[in-house]
Amino acid sequence: TLESLLIAKELLDRHEINRFAVVCLPHLCEQWQNEIKDKFGLDAEIIRSSTISRLEKKLRPDQNVFRDIPYQVISIDYVKQGNKRNIFLDHCPDFVIVDEAHTCAKPTGANKYQQQRYRLLSDLANKPEQQLVLLTATPHSAQSEDFQSLIGLLNPKFETYQHQNS
């Protein structure tokens, strides 16, 4: 957590970015918001179904939360589907931290469109100027296809890489 925020802060200080988003599981939103405030003094807004009405009331009609709120903590389950997903992909910050990225792996045997979280990350990773940090403290499981689906976001060749046992 801290290391990814240090990267964001460094990019902010260098004026290489002027906003960022953390995409995380719903129950981790407050923890991320507190870390951002306590460690860096930045006021991040939590974006999820229970906060969206309040946030939108603060904005002008021509604004949207993903483009016009500089520091965002977003519930992945709020933003993974439908119109919200498309608006996020169109207007999200250039720097996005994805916490618990292992929960976004493509399920073994499934095609990539069967998993909404994976599809969101895949589309995000394919944006040309997107900077993406994937965080996970969960050890690599025996399901190599799941792991390959995540590293395939970094380079599509990795998703089809066949490991040779020696």
Task: Report residues per predicted region.
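SF2 helicase/translocase NTPase motor core
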Residues: 1-5, 9-127, 158-166
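Charged, alpha-helix-enriched surfaces in structured cytosolic catalytic cores
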Residues: 27, 142-145
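Alpha4-beta5-alpha5 "output face"
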Residues: 89, 140, 148-151
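Conserved AAA+/SF3 P-loop NTPase catalytic/coupling segment centered on the Walker-B
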Residues: 98, 144-147
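Conserved helicase ATPase motor motifs in RecA-like P-loop NTPase domains
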Residues: 102, 124, 128-143
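A short helix-turn-beta junction within AAA+ P-loop NTPase domains corresponding to the substrate/partner-engaging
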Residues: 147-160
